[in-house]
Amino acid sequence: MRIGVLSDLHCELEPAGSRWINTFEPEHLDRRTDAALAWFSEAEVDLILLLGDIVQFENPSDLAHMFARLAAADVAPLATVNGNHDLRLGEEFAERAREHGIRLLYEEPFDFDWIAVTGVAVERGPAPPQYVGRFAGWGGQADLVVVASHFPVLSEASRVAAAGLPYAGDLVNRADLEGRLGADPLPKVLLSGHIHSRCSARIGPLLQCTVGAFIEPPFDATIVEIDPKAGSVLRTARRLGEIAVTDPVFAADDEHWRWIDGCWETQPVASIAASTSELSQT
């Protein structure tokens, strides 16, 4: 299964000078979106996954614009989870997703060739700016589970803080989610965004790929290729903009892991070169 992944698009049709680690570039969002879609099409991805924060502000027209552009390209089925910024739109987020044929993974998990694909919904926590994750679970039999979550399930707070960068925070119930997912021995691939930094982490059955933001450096578009029978996961990140002086990247452009004896093991980068070459030829 090949999944094209985008996170933290923060669409604002009327640029407001927003920033997090670096300044947002909403004026280039459409162009970069089209470039990512062209790459996903060339690679023949099976799914395009949006990891939330589609919009920056409570503006339904921003959401409609982004969903319409992604859906109109008709590259592959679309699925999404919501981010904390998307909560500002209330039910509008889910309604617009359904209108454009975009699957809400926390409402509609699905299976693909022995891979269960599911999601975590972001909900408001007991006190602002706290957020809670509601995990959808999965049904049926699977060799591997993909969990899409806007917030990382494995915290990256220490890594990001050590680099002197701002950290966007974790879910209030993050540790509970980690414990629940880690207690089940089935291998799981966690795909997340939110922190605008590219990272990877692994513990027990959990392998987490956190993708960089799309609206600011590293302007990441990502393809994750999963072979559940071989226990193989390839992550290829492509920068669609210039490298910033403050570069929030803690993982290589290409990474490879295999599920071996009940845990995820890194594999030589050389093995990825062949895979990406094969991707370009399909």
For the regions a language model picked out, list residue spans one by one:
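N-terminal active-site segment of His-dependent metallophosphoesterases
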Residues: 1-64, 141, 282
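Beta-strand-turn-beta hairpins that frame and shape the catalytic cleft
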Residues: 1-5, 109-119, 139-146, 202-208
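Divalent metal-coordination and catalytic microenvironments
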Residues: 8, 48, 53, 66, ...
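Active-site environment of divalent metal-dependent phosphoester hydrolases
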Residues: 10-15, 56-60, 84-92, 108-111, ...
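A structural signal for the main folded, soluble domain(s) of proteins
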Residues: 28, 42-44, 147, 187, ...
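His/acidic metal-ligating clusters that form di-metal
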Residues: 35-47, 125-205, 260-279
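Extended active-site neighborhood of metal-dependent phosphoesterases/phosphodiesterases
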Residues: 60, 64-137, 180, 223
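Binuclear metal-dependent phosphoesterase catalytic core
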Residues: 198-282
